[in-house]
Design a protein with these regions (language model features):
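Non-heme di-metal
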Residues: 1-148
Length: 148
């Protein structure tokens, strides 16, 4: 909300953000309950979601360029997704500390390490793209300033 610099929009976005947070807590708690009831099945589902996740809007033409613009504004990017969403919920659920996961569930849990490694690589690659974008923007601003 603050990024838009418009008081009415900020207030509306604050309400949306609060509502989204309540949804996140609800779903996080539902998964936690699933882990208590059927840990192996829950880990398989967690794995499926993380392994198939794409950023909202991924299929929209020009998504990558728009994602970079959004990221440079500090709104959202793959690093934030990993650090603010994925890793905290995995810690909350104690995925890697649980002793009630076995068999196929254990394979899915171990493969979560690969997914996290892939997410870190994606975040690193995206940070490079973002840095190049910011560099281009700075050069463009310098050229504009030189014209004045």
């Amino acid at each position: 909300g603050v990024a838009c610099a418009e008081p009415i929009a900020q207030e509306l976005l604050k309400h949306i953000s609060n509502d989204e947070n309540l949804h996140m807590i609800f779903y996080r708690n539902m998964v936690e309950a699933g882990l208590e009831i059927a840990p192996n099945q829950a880990v398989k589902s967690i794995h499926k979601v993380l392994d198939n996740f794409t950023m909202p809007g991924y299929t929209i033409p020009g998504f990558r360029r728009n994602a970079v613009t959004i990221a440079t504004g500090g709104v959202y990017d793959p690093q934030l997704h990993l650090a603010e969403v994925v890793q905290p919920v995995l810690r909350k659920w104690r995925i890697f500390e649980r002793d009630d996961i076995n068999g196929e569930g254990e394979w899915y849990r171990e493969d979560l390490d690969r997914i996290i490694t892939d997410l870190k690589k994606t975040a690193s690659d995206f940070d490079e793209v973002k840095a190049k974008y910011l560099e281009r923007q700075a050069k463009r601003a310098e050229r504009q300033a030189a014209k004045v």
